[in-house]
Amino acid sequence: MNMIKDFLIISCTGKNDKIGLKINNNFFIHDFQNKIQNNEILVSTILNLTNKHKVKIDQNFSILINNGPGSFSTIRVALSVAKGIKISNKVKLFGFKNSYLPQFILENIEVLINENLIE
């Protein structure tokens, strides 16, 4: 079982793009209305969400990233942003396949964390 408590989950595959933030046992979701075309939108949304909830992004924080399948460019943008956060803040980074998360809700994400993450 993984010891992932606080995390950012990025599920941007070109369709129903979302990010989620679990911090201090609270879970927040941001739905993107349009396909993520560039990293500026994703980065500013992540910064706004983490600043709003006063998140400390450090080695105790994890990022979960959807590896697809989906839009190659959208997945690349999301992965690049996640890797940038990993490098700059020394967070743990995990990937998952789109099929392992049938619905973007906390209960399903917790099952995903316990069973289907790729380090």
Q: Where are the regions that the model predicts?
A:
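Oxyanion-binding and handling regions
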Residues: M1-E40, S44, K52-V55, L93-E119
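Structural motif
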Residues: D6, Q59-S62
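DPxDG-like acidic metal-binding loop motif
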Residues: S62-N67, F72-L93
